[in-house]
Amino acid sequence: MLSNTYSETALENARNVAPLLSDAAGEIEAERALTPAVLDAMHDAKLFRLTLPHRDNGLELPLPALAQVAEIIAGADASAGWCLGQAFGCAMSAAFMDKVPAQQVFGTRDAVLAWGAGV
């Protein structure tokens, strides 16, 4: 089954990224931002593409696998987990967009969208 393969890959990728997140936790907290190395690793692992539709080069991961990925990432660094959770919800919006605007927003490797109140 395709989604099982995607789920296993996503879980493996999350486990592989987790040590980097744990190691960077102090810097992430001090800077109040994910580090460039953390972002690169998360993008390389396609963690921000897990809820994007297949048509937008996403993985459309099922909810149980998403929860497991979120648990792994948040367990390694809560801030990275929060950012990933924001990205999960925002990326789901691509399913309701026409293809061209969705590609404009989510088409590049390092595309990630999050929204919320600015402070």
Language model regions located:
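Generic structural signal for well-ordered, non-membrane alpha-helical segments
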Residues: 3, 7-10, 14, 35, ...
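Residue-level marker of alpha-helix boundaries and capping positions
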Residues: 28-29, 60
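Glycine-rich flavin
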Residues: 36-44, 49-119
